[in-house]
Amino acid sequence: MAYWLMKSEPDVYGIDHLQREGSTLWDGIRNYQARNFMRSMQIGDRAFFYHSNTKPPGIVGLMEVVETEIVDPSQFDPNSKYFDPAASLQKPRWDCCRLRYLRHFPQLLSLDALRENFSPEQLG
């Protein structure tokens, strides 16, 4: 089992949203490195839910990968901010995965705390 770090802005889609829904399609990713990481994910892998663009940013909970190799439908929707005119049904460019809520952490693990307690090599 691998562990991943996945981020979202809490006012856009936070861990409370995921808890209410139970699971979600983690779509709209338009970064090639992140897309390639998602392509490496396996069912049963765990992901830390990181709240970004908030004060303070940090890890707030844990999710599980429950489905992989999903073609991201938002790339085909011209009304979506994630629309990609270069993508086609025959040659999709973006993938996503489905994640299931596992739990909130009792307290936020802040970015500052991560930096203070772990070296980049340890976080690897």
Regions found by a protein language model. Give the residues of each.
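Compositionally biased, charged N-terminal/linker segments
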Residues: 1-43
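Structured loops at beta-to-helix junctions and adjacent beta-edge loops in soluble globular domains
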Residues: 7-9, 50, 102
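Surface-exposed, flexible loop/turn segments at secondary-structure boundaries
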Residues: 11, 55, 71
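Short glycine/proline-enriched turns and hinge-like loops at secondary-structure junctions
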Residues: 17, 42, 57-60, 76
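A general structural signal for short secondary-structure junctions and capping/turn motifs
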Residues: 39-40, 55, 88-91
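Short, charged beta-turn/beta-strand-edge "cap" motif at the junction between a beta-strand
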Residues: 50-57
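Aromatic- and Lys/Arg-enriched surface recognition patch
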Residues: 61-124
